[in-house]
């Protein structure tokens, strides 16, 4: 069967035809504006194809950028979280240091006498069971600590040193069952002996006749009897008084002012002259005035309004319960009753 179309022209002829056609179009484009309009229309028509052909690349680039941004944001978020944790830890440490600094400042201001040498000690260990109430501090013989030395904190009397090592010392707390301390009621100077019960929040007053004027809320301070311990440092507050007509002695319980179960820093006291018997005594009126100033100072530290009338022991207890940081209350040393002369022990019982 004979083909419809004849044989195609040779390649050379087709090339010449294309060349002449191109030259003709170039000449026509420069002289005829209709060719320009036709070319513009064609470019407009195929412009959408350019966008369509480029869309996969745009989509892939967008996905890649989103993945990079997400990964970058996750890394930045992790870094920021870590920085936030570090800043929070620094803030907590700063708050702790502020509280600690406040406690140390109150501790250093607690002695009643300006002629007393004082030194801060840190509590290393504590034994506060019913049979033993003792702590170990980081001050020893090389630091000048000695057996019988008074130990206080910013709120009240802690106890006394009973043994001294080269670098550490053991302190007997005033709530230990083997410990007793001579005290007096700040309100009326009634003198009694306060003994430990084995509980960190309780003292017992020994041999108190039921006729003695002592009431719940009375503030007990060191009496200084025996010439060994200085007077005027707060020790405890009377919590309960039970009188029975069938018993000659009243049952009196008191609560130590110092928080013995939460001790961290304590203060060791030295008189300017180690011969305490030669230290000038403070009169009861001076003791009351000094302690009154301490109570008012404590109220001011806790941002409480100071009353126009003198603060009472009840006011002190209320402020103590509301204050977060321990108030600026002076404290002094403790003494076992058996350390005193027999005559003075009998004198206390009679009082």
From Swiss-Prot:
Supply the alphabetized keyword list.
Answer: Cell shape
* Matches recorded under Pfam families: MreC
Record's keyword annotation contains Signal: no
One GO term (biological process): regulation of cell shape
Q: Where are the stretches annotated Disordered?
A: 318-351
Report the GO terms under cellular component: plasma membrane
Provide the transmembrane region boundaries.
none
Family, according to the entry, reads as follows: Belongs to the MreC family.
The role this protein plays is:
Involved in formation and maintenance of cell shape.
Q: What is this protein called?
A: Cell shape-determining protein MreC
Q: What would be the name of the gene that encodes this protein? A: mreC
């Amino acid at each position: 069967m004979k083909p419809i179309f004849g044989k195609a022209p040779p390649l050379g002829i087709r090339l010449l035809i294309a060349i002449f056609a191109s030259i003709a179009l170039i000449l026509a484009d420069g002289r005829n504006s209709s060719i320009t309009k036709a070319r513009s229309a064609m470019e407009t028509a195929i412009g959408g194809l350019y966008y369509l052909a480029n869309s996969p690349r745009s989509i892939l680039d967008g996905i890649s950028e989103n993945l990079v941004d997400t990964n970058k944001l996750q890394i930045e978020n992790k870094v920021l979280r870590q920085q936030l944790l570090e800043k929070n830890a620094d803030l907590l440490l700063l708050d702790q240091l502020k509280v600690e600094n406040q406690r140390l400042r109150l501790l250093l201001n607690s002695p009643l006498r300006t002629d007393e040498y004082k030194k801060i000690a840190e509590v290393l260990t504590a034994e506060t069971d019913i049979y033993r109430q003792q702590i170990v501090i980081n001050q020893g013989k090389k630091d000048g600590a000695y057996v019988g030395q008074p130990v206080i904190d910013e709120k009240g009397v802690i106890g006394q040193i009973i043994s001294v090592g080269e670098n550490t010392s053991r302190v007997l707390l005033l709530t230990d069952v083997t410990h007793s301390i001579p005290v007096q009621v700040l309100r009326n100077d009634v003198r009694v002996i306060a003994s430990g019960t084995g509980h960190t929040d309780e003292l017992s007053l020994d041999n108190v006749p039921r006729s003695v004027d002592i009431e719940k809320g009375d503030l007990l301070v060191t009496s200084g009897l025996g010439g060994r311990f200085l007077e005027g440092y707060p020790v405890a507050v009377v919590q309960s008084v039970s009188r029975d007509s069938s018993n000659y002695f009243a049952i009196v319980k008191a609560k130590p002012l110092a928080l013995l179960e939460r001790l961290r820093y304590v203060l060791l006291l030295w008189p300017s002259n180690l011969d305490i018997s030669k230290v000038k005594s403070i009169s009861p009126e001076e003791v009351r005035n000094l302690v009154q100033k301490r109570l008012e100072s404590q109220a001011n530290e806790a941002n409480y309004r100071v009353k126009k009338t003198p603060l009472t022991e009840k006011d002190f207890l209320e402020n103590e319960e509301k204050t977060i940081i321990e108030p600026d209350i002076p404290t002094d040393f403790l003494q076992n009753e058996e350390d005193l002369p027999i005559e003075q022990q009998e004198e206390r019982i009679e009082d």
